[in-house]
């Protein structure tokens, strides 16, 4: 009798995706972040569901409903902080996952990469709308500032902003629709992640060398299931440590102040994971230019496969490209730092230089360096 997992219509899909999947034998821990992102998504959906049972999306009661969750609901504080810090872990895993793709040339799987870029946009949209829901000062002013950016779009901008707000300012209608979208988007993200995996399994995984691994494949289970479980345990350890010891480390104290539309916080800034894009937005004095730069800072990822000029796929054997990659990482860390600083000298000029360097590295320096390395190898 043939094994049930190989014949049952549903088990067959699971088997070919997680058990008998032929996997390169040399993939490193950098390949763990896909499964960790899956864990993060499940944690966010489960904790979010329990939060939604007690949350009210009304401007009068939203803030107090979050307070009620933390004070009166059994382990409500734990669920709330798991959800808030789970978002931070989600973005840490996302950035490392994208960084791995850039370093090892995984972007050559075009469909997988493009779905990944779409996923990144969807997760960023979800996180932004989630940040508005507690209805603290930073929630309100963050929503006002970011939605207002759409008014930079010529001709339809002003109408578009009022359409999103559902009125003439960020108010009850805005909060209600943001809650609705924040609830539905994670399920869309889960579906997109399924498509992401579908495209990945069409080609098979890349590996650190960037070479074909068809001659040396091993089954996913037990080798990589146990490796993924170790990664998950480490992720849960870091998340629970953060939640139980310093849950507000990555948050903004301004969000513990209820909304006051008449009082603007001294420094309006988003959560830490958006600071790099926020710094790029602020580095351009023109409103429309800033919005375009903001969108392009993420959208530039979709262009990277077409700028791949090297004869090798991975950066493993390309020391000059490696140098530029780590300069890019340092540049992104600099932008993250600048995004959290006030708009004054010397932060303005540092932000502008870091923004120029970001686009220069990706669009110009990396492709030219790859051509130079090809010549070094006499190709």
Curated annotation (Swiss-Prot):
Localization, UniProt: Mitochondrion inner membrane
Protein's name in the database: Cytochrome b
Cell division is among the record's keywords: no
Transmembrane stretches, start-end: 33-53, 77-98, 113-133, 178-198, 226-246, 288-308, 320-340, 347-367
Pfam families: Cytochrom_B_C, Cytochrome_B
Cofactor: heme b
Keywords: Electron transport, Heme, Iron, Membrane, Metal-binding, Mitochondrion, Mitochondrion inner membrane, Respiratory chain, Transmembrane, Transmembrane helix, Transport, Ubiquinone
Residues reported in the UniProt entry to bind heme b b562: 83, 182
Sites where the protein binds a ubiquinone: 201
Quaternary structure, from the entry: The cytochrome bc1 complex contains 11 subunits: 3 respiratory subunits (MT-CYB, CYC1 and UQCRFS1), 2 core proteins (UQCRC1 and UQCRC2) and 6 low-molecular weight proteins (UQCRH/QCR6, UQCRB/QCR7, UQCRQ/QCR8, UQCR10/QCR9, UQCR11/QCR10 and a cleavage product of UQCRFS1). This cytochrome bc1 complex then forms a dimer.
Domain of life: Eukaryota
Other notes: Heme 1 (or BL or b562) is low-potential and absorbs at about 562 nm, and heme 2 (or BH or b566) is high-potential and absorbs at about 566 nm.
Family per record: Belongs to the cytochrome b family.
Family matches, as InterPro entries: Cyt_b/b6_C, Cyt_b/b6_C_sf, Cyt_b/b6_N, Cytb/b6-like_sf, Cytochrome_b, Cytochrome_b_C_euk/bac, Cytochrome_b_N_euk/bac, Di-haem_cyt_TM
The keyword Transmembrane belongs to this UniProt entry's keyword annotation: yes
């Amino acid at each position: 009798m043939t094994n049930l997992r190989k014949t049952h219509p549903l088990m067959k899909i699971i088997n070919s995706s997680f058990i008998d999947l032929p996997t390169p034998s040399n993939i490193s821990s950098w390949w763990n972040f896909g499964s960790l992102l899956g864990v993060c998504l499940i944690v966010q959906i489960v904790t979010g569901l329990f939060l939604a049972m007690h949350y009210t999306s009304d401007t009068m009661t939203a803030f107090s409903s979050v307070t009620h969750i933390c004070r009166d609901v059994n382990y409500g504080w734990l669920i709330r902080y798991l959800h808030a810090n789970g978002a931070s872990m989600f973005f840490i895993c996302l950035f490392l996952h994208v960084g791995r793709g850039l370093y090892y040339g995984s972007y050559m799987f075009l469909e997988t990469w493009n779905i990944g870029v779409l996923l990144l946009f969807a997760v960023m949209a979800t996180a932004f709308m989630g940040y508005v829901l507690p209805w603290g000062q930073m929630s309100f002013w963050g929503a006002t500032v970011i939605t207002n950016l759409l008014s930079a779009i010529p001709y339809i901008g002003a109408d578009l902003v009022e359409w999103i707000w559902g009125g003439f300012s960020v108010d009850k209608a805005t909060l209600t629709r943001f809650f609705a979208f924040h609830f539905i988007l994670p399920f869309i993200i889960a579906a997109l992640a399924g498509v992401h995996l579908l495209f990945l399994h069409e080609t098979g995984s890349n590996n650190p060398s960037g070479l074909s691994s068809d001659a040396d494949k091993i089954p996913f289970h037990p080798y990589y299931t146990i490796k993924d479980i170790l990664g998950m345990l480490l992720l849960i350890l870091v998340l629970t440590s953060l939640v139980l010891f310093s849950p507000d480390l990555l948050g903004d104290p301004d969000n513990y102040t209820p909304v006051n539309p008449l009082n603007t916080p001294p420094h309006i800034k988003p959560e830490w994971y958006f600071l790099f894009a926020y710094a790029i937005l602020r580095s351009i004095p023109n409103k429309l230019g800033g919005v375009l730069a903001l969108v392009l800072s993420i959208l530039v990822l979709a262009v990277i496969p077409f700028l791949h000029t090297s004869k090798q796929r991975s950066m493993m054997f390309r020391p000059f490209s490696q140098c530029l990659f780590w300069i890019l990482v340092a540049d992104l860390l600099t932008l993250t730092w600048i995004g959290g600083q006030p708009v004054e000298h010397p932060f303005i000029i540092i932000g502008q230089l870091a923004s120029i360097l970001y686009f220069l590295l990706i669009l110009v320096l990396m492709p030219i360096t790859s051509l130079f390395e090809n010549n070094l190898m006499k190709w």
